């Protein structure tokens, strides 16, 4: 039975490899029958940004971004005072903390990185 899954990425992709790996996992979940949404908190929004030179594992990220775009994976980005600009060709909604909290609580399963 398909599940509603949230993949929450909260770590800075400039400091650890985990955000890119989390995005790869989300891609794998999306390829199946599950409804997968990726929630990017804080600096994790850099994964979808134009300036990716300082992201760890950028080669891996660049390999998976086309598939993420093609599958139209849904992203929710934390609405902060100084938002990180993301590429236009992703399916992105900016939401406040309370909306994100409610969304995560409504999921069947949540993976946090």
PLM segments and residue spans:
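Short, well-ordered beta-strand core segments
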Residues: 75, 110-111
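Residues at the starts of beta-strands that form the adenosine-phosphate
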Residues: 4, 34-37, 74
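A glycine-rich helix N-cap at a beta->alpha junction
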Residues: 54-81
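Active-site regions of enzymes building and remodeling cell-envelope glycoconjugates
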Residues: 88-98
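An anion/phosphate-binding loop that grips the pyrophosphate of nucleotide cofactors and donors
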Residues: 107
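Short, glycine-rich nucleotide/cofactor-binding loops
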Residues: 6-20, 45-53
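Short beta-alpha junction loops
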Residues: 41-46, 80-82
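Histidine-anchored nucleotide/phosphate-binding helix
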Residues: 19-38
């Amino acid at each position: 039975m398909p599940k509603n899954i949230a993949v929450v990425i909260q770590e800075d992709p400039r400091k650890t490899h985990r955000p890119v790996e989390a995005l790869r996992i989300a891609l794998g979940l999306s390829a199946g029958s599950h409804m997968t949404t990726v929630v990017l908190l804080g600096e994790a929004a850099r994964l979808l940004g134009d300036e990716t030179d300082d992201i760890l594992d950028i080669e891996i990220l660049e390999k998976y971004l086309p598939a993420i775009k093609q599958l139209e994976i849904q992203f929710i980005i934390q609405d902060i005072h100084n938002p990180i600009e993301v590429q236009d060709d992703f399916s992105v909604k900016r939401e406040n903390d309370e909306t994100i909290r409610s969304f995560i609580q409504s999921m069947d399963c949540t993976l946090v990185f």
